[in-house]
Amino acid sequence: MAEHAAHGPLTGLKVVEFQGIGPGPHVAMMLADLGAEVVRIERPGHQPMNPVVERARHRAAVDLKSEEGQRFVHEALKHADVLVEGFRPGVMERLGLGPDVLLEANPRLVYARMTGWGQDGPLAQAAGHDLNYIAITGALDSIGAKGELPIPPQNLVGDFGGGSMYCAMGILAALYERERSGKGQVVDAAIVDGVTSLMSFFYGQPHSALRTTERGAGLLGGAAHFYRCYECADGKEVSVGAIEPQFYAELLQRADAPEELREGQMNPANWDDYTEKLAALFKTKPQAEWVKLLEGTDACFAPVVPLDEAKDHPHMKARGAFVEHGGRSHTAPAPRFDRTPGTIRDSAQDGEEVVARWSQGG
């Protein structure tokens, strides 16, 4: 058994986060979960919108247009390792907090800019949200049922998949490079860039059952009978993802599916008919019975669990995917580290106290 350190792998990292929405706070949450000390610059009077995503911050209410506020922020950033901001391009420059100014004062600063469209390009100054950003990458066009409008996939794909995850990776890469050069740099983390990168698998596939330009028609897009969701007798739902022949065979055997489904699994001409037959089969039993038959096997099966019930699923409980902290259920820090695990910490100090300590070398 590895001996656990007191804090996560980013212990000692000093981060200044400017209040924002969506992916920016998620970046700071991930860094804080893994041990970074995060001072959050907030507008005076701000009330936390999401206590889970905004956890483990040392808050400072700052008027960025006042002399006092400017002095405080510049002092904080003189000692910080990382800055995270999500304003439109040019806002930080107009506040006197652009990269040229701050990197001159602190050449080791990693300056992370989290936006939808990026720092340049014809759409850089346009308003937008997750749905708009993924719309121009080709991702949204492929999500939904055949002959119907695209379905917004929450804001997982853009804000958090192509946004905060890539921004965090960029920050860590810049910190790693800083160990060699001694210099910080700007990380331009645009959601459109991240989502395009997420789509590399699809852009790289030839036109086939895996990649099609028709919505709802690909193997992974919901057309295949062995990779989709089905309704059960009680109205609850299940997911099946039995792509490989051996897993498909196990699904059919354990579910006691019609014999004819065993032939022609990968022939798209069969998919509509086979989908109807599996849909009828899954309607014969409630979800709990299908769970007893299929969960934990090689049938590639899982029940569709509502958001508010996810923490109670046996596997999620066994993994400790949710933790209780401060009287609230929180998502656990991820990923897991065997020697320096992340943890959810209290925000015991206010931001001004933390910056004062940084200024004194602490």
Predicted regions located by residue number:
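Active-site loop/turn elements of alpha/beta-hydrolase fold enzymes
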Residues: A36, R43, L64, P89, ...
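Flexible, small-/acidic-enriched active-site or ligand-binding loops
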Residues: A2-A6, H325-G362
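A glycine-rich dinucleotide-binding beta-alpha-beta segment and adjacent secondary-structure elements
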Residues: E295-I344
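A structured beta-alpha segment of the ubiquitous adenosine-cofactor-binding alpha/beta core
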Residues: H4, V16, V53-A105
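Active-site-adjacent "lid/gating" segments in soluble enzymes
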Residues: M30-L34, L95-V238, A242-I243, G342
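Conserved small-residue-rich beta-alpha loop and adjacent elements
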Residues: H7-H46
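Aromatic-enriched alpha-helical interface/lid elements that frame and gate functional surfaces
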Residues: F226-T297, F301
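Conserved dinucleotide-binding and phosphotransfer motif residues
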Residues: L34, H79, T297
